[in-house]
Amino acid sequence: MDGALINSVLYVSPRNGAHYFVELTEKHLLAFEMLNSMCLLENYDHVLLFLECQFGKSHNLAVIPFDIILVLFTLSTLSEYYKEPILRANDPYNTSRETLSRRALKLLQKYLAILKEFDSEQYNLYDLELLRCQFFLAIDTLTPKKQKWGFDRFRRTKSESGVTYRQNASVDPELDQAKTFKNPYRSYISCLEQRNTILGNRLLNLKLNEPGEFINMILWTLSNSLQESTPLFLSSHEIWMPLLEILIDLFSCRQDYFIQHEVAQNVSKSLFVQRLSESPLAVFFESLNTRNFANRFSEYVFLNCDYKLPSDNYATPVHPVYNGENTIVDTYIPTIKCSPLYKSQKSLALRRKLIGSCFKLLLRVPDGHRLITPRIVADDVIQGISRTLASFNDILQFKKFFMTENLSQESYFIPLLAEGTLSEILKDTQECVVILTLVENLSDGVSFCNEVIGLVKSKCFAFTEQCSQASYEEAVLNIEKCDVCLLVLLRYLLHLIGTEAILDAKEQLEMLHAIEKNDSGRRQWAKALNLGNDPPLLYPIVSQMFGVHDKSVIIE
């Protein structure tokens, strides 16, 4: 993320608690009025067409007003698989263009990319600050307010699957028009002052501010992201996964701006924690509304993943955000069938992003302090997530969670989870507790290699007598998960210090030696059991990571 997005405040004029607020020029006021007028007439195709035609023409950025951003968010929920008749009625002459929902989503993604790049050489600085203001106004409107009851209070029933599906969306409560919408710009009339729904769907900001609906949206998205049921998967894949990714990015941008400009500098640690507890990400995670945050967060973020549920597990109820999302209209014909590999990759990437946002919040908490709300402690979250990952039954899902390409962006939490997960697995498979300091040693290649050598020689990555007591499949699964954790940590080691720092060092060669010898032991174990298939091997991957090709590490 470009620092200019956070630091640029040349045109900012704080108002009503919104430090980021930017006043309108006459030119932008005319554009805002025109877009709102088209929305009042439900001429959504023209709204989208106007915005689409602005891209790539010049350096002038067509700034989208925050109320139209909320309209685009809601339009994005109108996927044709369950709304095709309504979409056709609104846009009857569309025989070649994409649907309104896909066009709205693409526009949101394009504008978000411009916002994150914040390139003042490409666009006028005033336009960029005004665009930031509009997105921040929208995300502050979407932020769930404190409620008298929440999702966590709903009745939970015993279940073996971890999730219970309810068929219908929640009933929309009556709206108090005075409390539904407040336009900070009194120079024009917003369409949202007169409209609460878009083609039958209540405005997304109003829907998500209903009690329990914000967390239900997240759970509905995560649970359906791995579904085999076509309408449920489409609901997640076409609507809520891309929308939730946008929301997480916006909350992250808003958080950075809040810390930079809305928290007084040089305040005491106690006062800083108090302000941090009021920050956008804190409010975001407070929507979980639970006292036992670490365990419940782990349960929620891995909802519907394949892992061993605790014996006292209770099902988490979820329901459609909008009515009809769990059905397919007769006129819609699915054209794409996604593989389990694709589903796992997309689903686990989103879950990882959600976890990363939680750790981004926790990184700001000073040592010796804890957030007031939500009551999160970093060590508890690491342990809860690591415990769940260690109990995964699906190695594909496990790999897709850890094998990320964004090493730099996720370096502040993925190594901790890899080490924590490895520790939890070893706790279950070894006769003694193994204390790991691999993350501490990531900046010291020699110490890291020495620790790995010790773990390998202690048979932490070998098939042991305890493995023989379990089934072959379970033993192999545990070994594969241990291998993945080690490979993740090795990737970060090489990312942080570079291959050259330890290339051909005595400790590196000894580590490769120990791993190759360990692989030999795995083969002997499989041969002794007459299994026929080769067990998972670690050395071929590690040697490739360290650039060992023609070299041979001789086993004594």
Swiss-Prot record:
GO terms for cellular component: chromosome, telomeric region; nucleus; Smc5-Smc6 complex. Its main location: nucleus. GO terms for biological process: chromatin looping; DNA repair; double-strand break repair via homologous recombination; regulation of telomere maintenance. It comes from the Eukaryota. It holds the Pfam family Nse5. One of its GO terms (molecular function) is ATPase inhibitor activity. It is found in: Nucleus; Chromosome. Keywords: Chromosome, DNA damage, DNA recombination, DNA repair, Nucleus. InterPro entries: DNA_repair_Nse5/Nse6. Acts in a DNA repair pathway for removal of UV-induced DNA damage that is distinct from classical nucleotide excision repair and in repair of ionizing radiation damage. Functions in homologous recombination repair of DNA double strand breaks and in recovery of stalled replication forks. Component of the Smc5-Smc6 complex which consists of KRE29, MMS21, NSE1, NSE3, NSE4, NSE5, SMC5 and SMC6. Interacts with KRE29. Present with 907 molecules/cell in log phase SD medium. This is Non-structural maintenance of chromosome element 5.
